[in-house]
Every structure is written in C-alpha cells, then in structure tokens.
UniProtKB/Swiss-Prot annotation:
Contributes to the neddylation of all cullins by transferring NEDD8 from N-terminally acetylated NEDD8-conjugating E2s enzyme to different cullin C-terminal domain-RBX complexes and may play a role in the cell cycle progression by regulating the SCF ubiquitin E3 ligase complex, after UV damage. At the cell membrane, can promote and as well inhibit cullins neddylation. It is found in: Cell membrane; Cytoplasm; Nucleus; Cytoplasm, Perinuclear region. A lipid is attached at G2 (N-myristoyl glycine). The keyword Iron does not apply. Residues 1-87, 284-304 are annotated as: Disordered. Gene3D superfamilies: Cullin, PONY binding domain, EF-hand. Keywords: Cell membrane, Cytoplasm, Lipoprotein, Membrane, Myristate, Nucleus. The keyword Protein transport does not apply. This is DCN1-like protein 3. One of its GO terms (biological process) is regulation of protein neddylation. One of its GO terms (molecular function) is cullin family protein binding. The gene is Dcun1d3. It comes from Mus musculus. The lineage of its organism: Eukaryota, Metazoa, Chordata, Craniata, Vertebrata.
C-alpha cells in the first residue's frame, strides 16, 4: 500500500399597514386639493400627507420603517454566513498546505505531511476512518472536493479540529451499521480506480482486512489470512463478493468452523479455506499425538 493508507443565505418592515385617524380639520382641505394634484407616494408605498395619531407623517414613518435595523433572525443568519465563510477560508489554507504543486489534490507526499501533523501513522486505522468520512476514491490521495466535503462532514476546519474528532469516529465505527458501511467502503478504497480494477490484489486485501478489523478482530481472521498467505498461487485476487461475504462469514460461522456448510451460497474460496483449515488442524492434532506417543517409551531422564 506504499507508505499510507489513503492514496491515506430584505428585512421586512415591522410597522403595520393600518391608517391612523385623520384630523377632522383637514377633511375639506383634502377634498379641495384632490382635483389639483395627485398625492406623492414614497418608496415604501405610503401616501404623503397622512398623519399618524402621534403627529408623525406616514411617509416619514414608512421611510423610517425602510431604515429599521435588521431583526435578530436576520442578524443570526448573517453571523452564520460569516462563520461559514471564515471556515471555508481556513479549509482553503489547510488544503493548500498539503496540496501538490501541479495537481489540485493532496497526493502521497502531502498525505504523509498531513498525517505527520495529525500525529498519526499513515497506515493506521484512524487514517482509514478519515478516508471513509472523506469518501476518498483512491489510496494516498484526497481531491479538493473530498477534502472539503469530508471536513464539513466531521465539522472540522483545522488540524486540531480533525484530531478532536478521532475519538467519536472510533466510537461510530463500532456501531454495526456504520462498520458495515466502513467495511464495504474499504474494498472500493483499495482498488486502483485509474486502472479500472475490479478485484483487490491478494497482498492489498490482506493488509486491508487486518486494518479494517482493528477494533474487532474476529476469531477466524488469523486463520483466513494465513490461508491467503500460504496459498498465493491459487488466489489471484479478492472479488467484491468474496470481500463482502467474508463479513457475514465472521458473524455466523463459529471459530471451530463446524457449522459451515458447502451447500449454502458461500463463495467457492470459502469452501477451499474451510477444507484447508480442517486439514491443518487435523495434522496439528496428529502431530501432538505422535509426540506424546514417542515420549511414553522414554525414561524420565530421557524425556527431560
């Protein structure tokens, strides 16, 4: 896998529209003037000359209404927008710190510096969790979109902020549904998308199985990985179906493999594994029996 897991939003007026009582002495004057001129309508749509009870002209009140300060809700939205803009600026600065000089992405060298600043090893489980949250498509690479969307997903815009999210990510990965999503992501993550791979190389699959089961190591995992390691010629690659079904295998098949049935719809590689493991255990038992038989005919001094 190389040196890293990841390739590692117009305030409205607060005044009502009701007209105030008019001064009775103004009635005749208003009628006489109506035929000579039209009332001027100010920008807020209030007829000029209308007087409120407190003596203020409606036009003036309307103008003041247009100039009222924003409501607390508008101020809150503005504050939120400013905070989002500041966060985006910090993310931009953080991304530029690690991005490649030619490509608008964080590549292997930048990834190593990123992990170093996070105080994590590029090959450890926490980096896989980060790649999962970033939905990284390729090992040792974060595109701009992956980096920005991922940091937003975990509500972090700084090195300290990302580090502070690790404990909650580790806890989240222990949930059955979340782990299943992480597990399936890991297969796709291990593929070389640029080469159009459809199956994992055996060595990559072994490393990723060890990594993804960091917090919950099933009893049969070690035997499974030994089988893959000792039979390189018979295993060209690990398909998506085999990868996905292995999680089911660890959940329903006991460590002694006694409840495994070839009649069920398991991948053929599982049949081969169970047969291989049973033979290995048989030889192990026979070997212990032979050793015990050989020691029975020896004198106490010879046994020691």
């Amino acid at each position: 896998m190389g040196q890293c897991v990841t390739k590692c939003k117009n305030p409205s007026s607060t005044l009502g529209s009701k007209n105030g009582d008019r001064d009775p002495s103004n009635k005749s004057h208003s009628r006489r003037g109506a035929s000579h001129r039209e009332e001027q309508v100010p920008p807020c749509g209030k007829p000029a000359g209308d007087i409120l009870v407190n003596g203020t002209k409606k036009a003036e009140a309307a103008t003041e209404a247009c100039q009222l300060p924003t409501s607390s809700g508008d101020a809150g939205r503005e504050s939120k927008t400013n905070a989002e803009e500041s966060s985006l600026q910090r993310l931009e600065e953080l991304f530029r710190r690690y991005k490649d000089e030619r490509e608008d992405a964080i590549l292997e060298e930048g990834m190593e510096r990123f992990c170093n600043d996070l105080c994590v090893d590029p090959t450890e489980f926490r980096v896989l969790l980060l790649a999962w949250k970033f939905q990284a498509a390729t090992m040792c690479k974060f595109t701009r979109k992956e980096f920005f969307d991922g940091c937003k997903a975990i509500s972090a815009d700084s090195i300290d902020g990302i580090c502070a999210r690790f404990p909650s990510l580790l806890t989240e990965a222990k949930q059955e549904d979340k782990f299943k999503d992480l597990y399936r992501f890991t297969f796709q993550f291990g593929l070389d998308s640029e080469e159009g791979q459809r199956s994992l190389h055996r060595e990559i699959a072994i490393a990723l199985w060890k990594l993804v089961f960091t917090q919950n190591n099933p009893p049969v995992l070690d035997q499974w990985l030994n089988f893959l390691t000792e039979n390189p010629s018979g295993i060209k690659g690990i398909s998506r179906d085999t990868w996905n079904m292995f999680l089911n295998f660890t959940q329903v098949i006991g460590p002694d493999l006694s409840n495994y049935s070839e009649d069920e719809a398991w991948p053929s590689l599982f049949d081969t594994f169970v047969e291989w493991e049973m033979e290995r255990r048989k030889r192990e038992v026979e070997g212990r029996g032979t050793l015990s038989s050989g020691q029975e005919g020896l004198c106490p001094e010879e046994q020691t």
